[in-house]
């Protein structure tokens, strides 16, 4: 049996460990080296899963990038978009900008499971999604960069905020600027570079029908739409056709992450209104030069995109003792107190 003195000493150690643990977390900042010791292979684990997913789903890289974008625009990059419905909150998956369009959730589940097997209770779902977005861009031909990490996961979802914050495909340029500025992305380069995420992936016909047939209730197509491209889109999305049919965002290189999106905008071949607004809106005096610059130089776009991604990834992140590290990205941990105790015991054991 343990003596009372040894038991007391053990609890003192645990208490000191708790204090050190929470003190270390409270000062946490996002850094690319966050998992260098605790989970050094996390990026490779994520990358390998995505490579495997691409064999059966060529759209998955674009879908994961979109998930990350829609996560960060709603209460910051906290993996709240991954949560399912509960009796306490409604899922963001049913928001107007996500319902029947956001995809890739099973892939994120598989990535998280693989990461958990390698590094239990270590890497948050928010960081898993952030790393997955970066790897997806690179696997599609885009830039590679070291992602600042150290985010924690939210304890709830924010359906109303998702409906309020997510930019819509019919937004005008002033509306786009307001939506981006609301979350701290107030530079024209943020808007133009991040919109370049539409250089790959697909969109449903239902989001462009008004542009093709009845723009602003005029009974006419959007006048900023290239007439040849208009006819191509009308063939793919007939007036009384299936509006769930998928159309490529980029008619030139639909599966490659490159700068052709901006070349398309210069030729009035942006698929959705909010894209073409960057070049054709009367208010586009500060975005047109950026579109031209990115169309002329891939590296200029890549550099601006990486900077904007890091700025977006830093929107009010949960760090330190905030939130939790979810074990299953779809649900909050069933007993957060027990989970905290396990984290503390692990920390003390490593001292």
Swiss-Prot record:
Sites where a glycan is attached: 41, 85, 214, 226, 242, 283
Segment forming the signal sequence: 1-28
Residues that hold Ca(2+) 2 according to the record: 199, 250, 253, 258
Site (Transition state stabilizer): 66
A Pfam family annotated for this UniProt entry: peroxidase
Tree of life domain: Eukaryota
Binding-site positions, heme b: 198
Subcellular location: Secreted; Vacuole
Family label: Belongs to the peroxidase family. Classical plant (class III) peroxidase subfamily.
Protein's name according to its UniProt entry: Peroxidase C1B
Biological classification of the source: Eukaryota, Viridiplantae, Streptophyta, Embryophyta, Tracheophyta
């Amino acid at each position: 049996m343990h003596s009372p003195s040894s038991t007391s000493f053990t609890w003192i150690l645990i208490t000191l460990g708790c204090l050190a643990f929470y003190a270390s977390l409270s000062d946490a900042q996002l850094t690319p080296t966050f998992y260098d010791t605790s989970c050094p292979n996390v990026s490779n684990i994520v990358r390998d899963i995505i490579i495997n997913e691409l064999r059966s789903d060529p759209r998955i890289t674009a879908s994961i990038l979109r998930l990350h974008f829609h996560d960060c625009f709603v209460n910051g990059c906290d993996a709240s978009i991954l949560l399912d419905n509960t009796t306490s909150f409604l899922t963001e998956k049913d928001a107007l900008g996500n319902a029947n369009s956001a995809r890739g959730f099973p892939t994120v589940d598989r990535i998280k499971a693989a990461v958990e097997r390698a590094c239990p209770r270590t890497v948050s779902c928010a960081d898993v999604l952030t790393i997955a977005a970066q790897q997806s861009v690179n696997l599609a031909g885009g830039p590679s960069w070291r992602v600042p990490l150290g985010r924690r996961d939210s304890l709830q979802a924010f359906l109303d905020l998702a409906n309020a914050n997510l930019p819509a495909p019919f937004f005008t340029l002033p509306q786009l600027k307001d939506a981006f500025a609301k979350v701290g992305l107030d530079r024209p380069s943020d808007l133009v570079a991040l919109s370049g995420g539409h250089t790959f992936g697909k969109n449903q016909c239902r989001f462009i029908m008004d542009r093709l047939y009845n723009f602003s209730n005029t009974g006419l197509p959007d006048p900023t739409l290239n007439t040849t491209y208009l006819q191509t889109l009308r063939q793919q999305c007939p007036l009384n056709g299936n509006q769930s049919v998928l159309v490529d965002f980029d008619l030139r290189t639909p599966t490659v992450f490159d700068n052709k999106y901006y070349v398309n905008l210069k030729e009035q071949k942006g698929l959705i209104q909010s894209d073409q607004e960057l070049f054709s809106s009367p208010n586009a005096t500060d975005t047109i030069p950026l579109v031209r610059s990115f169309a002329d130089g891939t590296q200029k776009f890549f550099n601006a995109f990486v900077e904007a991604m890091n700025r977006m990834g830093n929107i009010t992140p949960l760090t330190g003792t905030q939130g939790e590290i979810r074990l299953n990205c779809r649900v909050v941990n069933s007993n957060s107190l027990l989970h905290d105790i396990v984290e503390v015991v692990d920390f003390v054991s490593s001292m």
